[in-house]
Amino acid sequence: KAWEYIVAHRDDPYADADMQVSVTPPGKPLGVVDRRGVYLRGTEETHRTTQFLVTVQPSFRAGETKRAYALDVKASLCATQPWVHVPDFLALGSNGRTFEIRVAADTLPPGLHTARVVGRDTERNGTVVFDVPITVVKPVVPSNATYKYPRVRLSSGEIRREFVHVPSGATWADVCVRSMNHEAPNTSVRFWLHMLQLVPQRRLSRVEHHFVLALNENEPMSKRIPVHGGMTLELCAAQFWSNKAGFDLEMDVEFHGLDTVPQVSGHTGQ
């Protein structure tokens, strides 16, 4: 398929050109880019509509000045999801072009959502010229310090993932899990529990926690993990592929916080 595509499009004016796509985050001047696509994960940014500037810059090989000068692509823009808003058309030349997209994350339910903005050549049967990946991780915002993970049915190899906002000021969480309705009575179940936060300037091993748990039916088990308040916590439960018997899983996450307050005291001496 790849070879057939290359042969069919070898005469396209942008054949072998590198379409460099960059995204300017909101609040930063044009030209200050730090991302290839759009990724929203925090509570504040996933509960509003956010605007981004997308720059598409064609890059040709050395010595292809004439091809670069003659480039004139009349592209149509479309989003794969209705919560992403883009212009209808884009005129793309060798100098590149910038356009705006709006991501209405506030209209989405909690969970993981993905979309793409696709630019197609209107003069060549809709050939894809570039695309912009968009990912929104919208957390559940608990009304108090306890979050109750929805009861789920886990079968062999199944993965269930939830995202929850950690209340500001929380420094640790107690996670209590309980299994019930075992498909194979009087047996224990074995599954993987993984928890993760993305914290700036922290390596992954410092912000992720994972456990392999073996539970008897209706027997609770608790784990305590450090958390960072005001950030999204990912909770993932997965049953091992080698375990054939399914079960129901319940999980409660209770957040706690304890911060030290620096104080200065003075003493007189003789």
Could you tell me what each predicted segment is?
Residues 69-71, 107-108, 118-146, 182-187, ...:
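C-terminal edge strands of extracellular/lumenal beta-sandwich accessory domains
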Residues 44, 161-171, 223-229:
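Extracellular and analogous surface-interaction loops
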Residues 46-54, 95-97, 106-118, 158-160:
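Short, solvent-exposed loop/turn segments enriched in Ser/Thr/Gly
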